[in-house]
Amino acid sequence: MTTANEVLKQIKENDVKFVDLRFTDPKGKLQHVTMDVVCVDEDMFADGVMFDGSSIGGWKAINESDMVLMPDPETAHMDPFFAQSTMVIFCDILDPVSGEAYNRDPRGTAKKAEAYLKASGIGDTVFVGPEAEFFVFDDVKYKADPYNTGFKLDSSELPSNDDTDYETGNLGHRPRVKGGYFPVPPVDSSQDMRSEMLTVLSEMGVTVEKHHHEVAAAQHELGVKFDALVRNADKMQIYKYVVHQVANAYGKTATFMPKPIFGDNGSGMHVHLSIWKDGKPTFAGDEYAGLSESCLYFIGGIIKHAKALNAFTNPSTNSYKRLVPGYEAPVLLAYSARNRSASCRIPFGTNPKAKRVEVRFPDPTANPYLAFAAMLMAGLDGIKNKLHPGKAMDKDLYDLPPKELKKIPTVCGSLREALESLDKDRKFLTAGGVFDDDQIDSFIELKMQEVMRFEMTPHPVEFDMYYSV
């Protein structure tokens, strides 16, 4: 375990000029305040740094705005993007009066979920492996004014540029719709950029594995190694930061929106989960696909609470433009070995250590701390209450006849439905005080503001369909 003194030693050895204290707001956005190194000492690590939390959506009101950033020495790493030597440290949020963890701090919630797992006796570690996809565009323009609403995206990879005149000529070699998975360059035009992203991630302490082009034009994925829940939530925040920064350095712009382009695949964030105890995997056994009974119950919990989970795993109105049949979107609440059309998949693996559940409906707009914690709580509720998921569905669920299809439950169809589902189904989250009602209520209120704005704003497609009626 890295101590404050060890971090202070690293600061001297690396001639660090600034320390960037970072934390995550309820929406999942990384925030920061930069400290001059002269202010960084043992007292800062012991007492934390006061800041005004009233400007953070979903947090305290202006009359009780003081909060404490408490640096976590374990998370210290160098930021290669700044001109001045800068160390980054992730922080927890504390209440200055009680000194306790602030109940609406997402990272604090994730820590409580890990502690709840240990206290349950079911396991001592949950490993999480997220697979976040993203788009990179050459140019993006959007406007959401009352009299000017719309957007325009551009990338040299888009099929719409087949006949575009470029100064150096149009060289062709671009992926077709749903054809980006995964030809070599020059069809894949972003090999070097993704390699740079992976290199920087490794330099910042993230264990990397691979990268590749994704199904849609201008869509990509980086592969990082699984880790414990809080650590990999931290790493997912680093992942998104690096993707944005490297794309920017290449003169491009990256987005984790699930569905920026109609008619092509959207970006998901499949999440692999496995529980271990005393250094041994608990999900391996003699049941279906080599799973243990507790793993099946875990899946049962995910399926039972999926609609409530959607509020955290798919927390944007745009999320539900991805969660529609026909675009490899896992909308059907079923489980299967290897079958990618099911929302819960059991990846193939003969080694007991490889036994895990892949939850396929999350997307990268999720706050990783809240989403990972919520999925763990749903799975633990399944184990505690022995919620068997029923028979596995090994056929292609997309090709089922309508009569059979109607029998399979689905994920939510909108953010409004997800928030309403969370409001009704929350007891599994508040078990052990991991989440609490105040936190859930404030999250619903925060996200319902987005729903209302989206539902009340006229859409360009409506003009296309109705203007001349």
Swiss-Prot record:
Cofactor: Mg(2+)
Name of the featured protein: Glutamine synthetase
GO terms of molecular function: ATP binding; glutamine synthetase activity; metal ion binding
Residues annotated as binding L-glutamate: N265, G266, R322, E328, R340, R360
Keyword Secreted: no
GO cellular component, one term: cytoplasm
Keywords (A to Z) from UniProt: ATP-binding, Cytoplasm, Ligase, Magnesium, Metal-binding, Nitrogen fixation, Nucleotide-binding, Phosphoprotein
Protein source organism: Rhizobium meliloti (strain 1021)
Modified residue annotations for O-AMP-tyrosine: Y398
Protein family per UniProt: Belongs to the glutamine synthetase family.
GO BP: any one term: glutamine biosynthetic process
All copies of domain GS beta-grasp, residue ranges: 14-99
Main location per the UniProt record: cytoplasm
Means of activity regulation: The activity of this enzyme could be controlled by adenylation under conditions of abundant glutamine.
Assembly, per entry: Oligomer of 12 subunits arranged in the form of two hexameric ring.
Pfam family, one: Gln-synt_C
Task performed by this protein: Catalyzes the ATP-dependent biosynthesis of glutamine from glutamate and ammonia.
Gene behind this protein: glnA
Record localization: Cytoplasm
Binding site for Mg(2+) 1: E131, H270, E358
EC number(s) reported in the record: 6.3.1.2
